[in-house]
């Protein structure tokens, strides 16, 4: 039968790209060795080219490989070792005689190409199974070798675990000179090629100096033979199928019984034991409804076995080493999945904290039971919470794990309410964390919004909200770890207490900046047009639910106050003397301290900001400047009063009254007397410590409310008196109540801040008049000396007395008390004798 009567070869579905190899510069063409025609076919002469050179070309060959040489590797047992696979003879070699030296090769790394399905071979003589051009060749010993079993794949590269190499063109060596499709002539491959187990050269082996990239030098590698459609003997771990997703793998061709053998890659000659073992991937957890209460998950049907053969499309052909969490260990891990997975999934759908807070306020308006918690509709049913329509938090009784465990039928109504209260701590924290993440991702990390602000304004506006988010994430993770242990929550107050005494201090730092946040936000909205426009765009996003930015900035303080209310509700439901009650009391006390510190810091920052603004208005003229801004100082009261004075006239004119407007600033430890000036400036006239200021009402029923303000020691250490008029009686009462009135000395010590010019002495022992120049000193008396002589005598109000009889008073409290005693003594003496400033006898 001639070649003209044979049908044309059917091209493959995906023709692999061909690699055009350059022709060697100097190499003689091998003479055409006429071999026996294969299957009765003969070469066919093609039309001559323009240069009238003969261009012989091979015709399609139909050949059936021997049955003994096509034993599929997939038929080997799974436990077959690599040594047993390597000991087998290559399919295309007639003997197993080892080759002394392999052909040297160079490394090359071509790009891998997709594999195309290979059709199964047909019986001999069938005109429907054309193979690639192939002919019988002679072995090195001169004997004709058996028909080859290596398919010629031009440009076919396979990628694998060890970098599968290439399969180069193998032209027919029986022809002397042939041209490929691109006109390039190929040299016949007559050299020897190395096989894995030292088998004789294959029929289509390359010459020793073959320039093709597949036979270049690759140190440490040797040529391997693998089945078509398979992979090398690399341990493969099947991937676990998830019932929640569909397989996205490529469809594989059906498995064939007798696959052809094709050269696909190189394999390293290193020992197998030096390669790191591949660990199987951790199985992905499956939803509870798909693994516990539903059908078992089905494994992927496109997994490959260890020998690279498709496992099949039936679930019965799943690999035997499937992880037990998917097939065999479903009952053992059922409880673990029930504990962990079901408690995390509902928290992903929690509403924003603003929505949760509005729902809580609505619940209080909808009505509650007598014990402070919503009452169930029926006595035997689980307690149901009346909720308004819309997003709401998950209830403990709605969890699938709780419903499946039967706790709703065994727990008492009081314990069920306790579980709901404990679980609300978790769900509310999840809502709070979701809002914080939305604030951070949408506003804080927005580059468009950052470009409209200065770095200082950006830091002032958002402060340390990212640190607050980190604390909330760790707190929620600790709560979830406690909740996952059992559907029945034992206690959470100890977790709250542990975080309240430690990480929750970050709330104090954040709330301290609240005053600056409000001022910065108002200023930016009024003056920064770009900021307001970008902020409106971000607030209009669907994920923000049209909530304004200030509602996010107030979240930390709202959360810490809501947490205290939740702890109070838990404490009311705990049993007397139980561990829950003790933990709830500790947690409530720690959270209350955090709130008190937050409130104090808010007020302190407001006062500090007010002191800063007030300092910018003060002008100290002819008065020693005083540092006004202090963390311990706060402004308690300020008001405008009128000072009554006398303006002295000349000889012809008598004195006439003078009215001077004053502005008094009363701080927690200081009194400033100022006079208003233009431009809202205040000129400081005098100041004194608050403990050295006294106010007394002047009886004058016909005139406006008037009182006398006395400074026992002003900024110069001298006493001063002023007569002031108030605009109303209530204003005068406020000023009178702000200062201590003359009377018995208080038992509690006062805080002393200022010093007096003259020193004070305390008598340590009684003395006779002879020692004190006519005046006697009693023990514990407080004489006031004005001059100290070199002889050691002190001269003062009581007279001259020796210095060894007294000791100096250094305590500020005692000094202030003595000044007040002296002032009362002067007033008492002046009222009785008619001379207010008369010295004591």
Swiss-Prot record:
It is found in: Cell projection, Dendrite. Its main location: other. Interacts with EPHB2. Interacts with EPHA4. Residues 39-53 have a biased composition (Polar residues). Expressed in the vascular smooth muscle of coronary artery. GO terms for biological process: negative regulation of synapse maturation; positive regulation of stress fiber assembly; regulation of actin cytoskeleton organization; regulation of postsynapse assembly; regulation of small GTPase mediated signal transduction; retina vasculature morphogenesis in camera-type eye. Residues 65-110 have a biased composition (Low complexity). Residues 111-124 have a biased composition (Pro residues). Coiled coil: none annotated. The modification Phosphoserine is found at residues 107, 109. It holds the Pfam family RhoGEF. Residues 417-601 form the DH domain. It comes from the Eukaryota. GO terms for molecular function: GTPase activator activity; guanyl-nucleotide exchange factor activity. This is Rho guanine nucleotide exchange factor 15. Specific GEF for RhoA activation. Does not activate RAC1 or CDC42. Regulates vascular smooth muscle contractility. Negatively regulates excitatory synapse development by suppressing the synapse-promoting activity of EPHB2. GO terms for cellular component: cytoplasm; cytosol; dendrite; glutamatergic synapse; postsynapse. The gene is ARHGEF15. It comes from Homo sapiens. Phosphorylated on tyrosine residues upon EFNA1 stimulation. EPHB2-dependent phosphorylation at Tyr-353 triggers UBE3A-mediated ubiquitination.
């Amino acid at each position: 039968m001639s070649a003209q009567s044979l049908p044309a070869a059917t091209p493959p579905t995906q023709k692999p790209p061909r690699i055009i190899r350059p022709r060697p510069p100097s190499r003689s063409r091998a003479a055409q060795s006429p071999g026996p025609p294969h299957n009765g076919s003969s070469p066919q002469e093609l039309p001559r080219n323009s240069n009238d050179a003969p261009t012989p070309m091979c015709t399609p060959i139909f050949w059936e490989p021997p049955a003994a040489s096509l034993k599929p590797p997939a038929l080997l047992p799974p436990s077959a070792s690599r040594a047993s696979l390597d000991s087998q003879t290559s399919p295309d070699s007639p003997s197993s005689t080892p080759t002394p030296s392999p052909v040297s090769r160079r490394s090359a790394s071509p790009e891998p190409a997709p594999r195309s399905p290979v059709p199964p071979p047909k019986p001999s003589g069938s005109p429907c199974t054309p193979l690639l051009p192939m002919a019988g060749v002679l072995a090195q010993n001169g004997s004709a070798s058996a028909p080859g079993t290596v398919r010629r794949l031009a440009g076919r590269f396979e990628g694998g675990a060890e970098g599968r190499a290439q399969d180069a063109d193998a032209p027919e060596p029986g022809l002397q000179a042939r041209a490929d499709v691109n006109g390039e002539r190929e040299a016949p491959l007559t050299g020897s090629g190395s096989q894995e187990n030292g088998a004789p050269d294959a029929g289509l082996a390359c010459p020793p100096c073959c320039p093709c990239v597949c036979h270049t030098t690759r140190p440490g590698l040797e040529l391997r033979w693998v089945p078509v459609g398979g992979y090398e003997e690399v341990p493969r771990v099947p991937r676990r199928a998830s019932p929640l997703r569909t397989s996205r793998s490529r469809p594989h061709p059906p498995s064939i019984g007798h696959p052809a053998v094709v050269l696909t890659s190189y394999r390293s000659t290193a020992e197998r034991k030096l390669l790191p073992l591949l660990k199987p991937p951790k199985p992905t957890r499956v939803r509870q409804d798909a693994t516990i209460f539903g059908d078992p998950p089905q494994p992927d049907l496109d997994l490959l076995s260890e020998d690279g053969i498709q496992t099949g499309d039936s679930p019965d052909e799943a690999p035997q080493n499937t992880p037990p969490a998917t097939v065999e260990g479903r009952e053992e891990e059922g409880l673990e999945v029930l504990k962990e997975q079901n408690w995390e999934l509902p928290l992903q759908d929690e509403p924003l904290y603003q929505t949760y807070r509005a729902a809580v306020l609505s619940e209080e308006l909808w009505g509650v039971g007598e014990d402070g918690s919503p009452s169930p509709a029926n006595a035997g049913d689980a307690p149901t919470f009346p909720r308004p329509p819309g997003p709401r938090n998950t209830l403990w009784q709605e969890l699938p794990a709780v419903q499946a465990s039967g706790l709703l039928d065994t727990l008492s109504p009081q314990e069920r309410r306790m579980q709901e209260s404990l679980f609300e701590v978790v769900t509310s924290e999840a809502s709070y964390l979701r809002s914080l993440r939305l604030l951070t991702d949408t506003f804080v990390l927005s580059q468009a919004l950052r470009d409209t602000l200065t770095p200082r304004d950006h830091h002032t506006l958002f402060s340390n909200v990212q640190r607050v988010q980190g604390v909330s994430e760790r707190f929620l993770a600790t709560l979830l770890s406690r909740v996952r242990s059992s559907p029945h929550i034992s206690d959470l107050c100890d977790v709250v207490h542990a975080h309240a005494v430690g990480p929750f201090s970050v709330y104090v730092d954040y709330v301290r900046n609240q005053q600056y946040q409000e001022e910065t936000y108002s200023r930016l909205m009024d003056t920064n047009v770009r900021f307001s426009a970008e902020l409106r765009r971000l607030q209009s996003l669907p994920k923000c639910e049209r909530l304004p930015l200030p509602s996010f900035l107030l979240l930390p303080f709202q959360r810490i106050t809501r947490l205290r209310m939740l702890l109070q509700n838990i404490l009311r439901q705990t049993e007397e003397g139980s561990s829950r009650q003790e933990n709830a009391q500790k947690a409530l006390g720690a959270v209350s301290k955090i709130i008190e510190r937050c409130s104090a810091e808010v007020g302190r920052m407001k006062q500090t900001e007010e002191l800063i603004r007030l300092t910018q208005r003060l002008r100290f003229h002819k008065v020693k400047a005083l540092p006004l801004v202090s963390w311990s100082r706060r402004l308690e009261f300020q008001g405008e009063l009128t000072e009554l004075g006398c303006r002295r006239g000349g000889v012809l004119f008598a004195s006439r009254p003078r009215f001077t407007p004053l502005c008094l600033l009363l701080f927690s430890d200081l009194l400033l007397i100022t006079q208003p000036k233009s431009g809202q400036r205040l000129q400081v006239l005098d100041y004194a410590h608050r403990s050295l200021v006294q106010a007394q009402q002047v009886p004058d029923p016909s005139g406006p409310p008037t009182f006398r303000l006395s400074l026992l020691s002003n900024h110069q250490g001298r006493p001063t008196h002023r007569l002031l008029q108030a605009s109303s009686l209530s204003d005068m009462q406020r000023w009178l109540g702000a200062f201590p009135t003359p009377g018995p000395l208080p038992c509690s010590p006062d805080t002393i801040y200022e010093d007096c010019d003259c020193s004070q002495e305390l008598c340590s022992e009684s003395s006779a008049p002879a020692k004190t120049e006519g005046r006697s000193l009693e023990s514990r008396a407080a004489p006031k000396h004005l001059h100290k002589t070199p002889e050691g005598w002190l001269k003062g109000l009581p007279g001259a007395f020796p210095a060894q009889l007294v000791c100096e008073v250094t305590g500020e409290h005692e000094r202030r008390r003595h000044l007040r005693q002296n002032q009362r003594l002067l007033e008492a003496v002046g009222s009785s004798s008619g001379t207010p400033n008369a010295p004591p006898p």
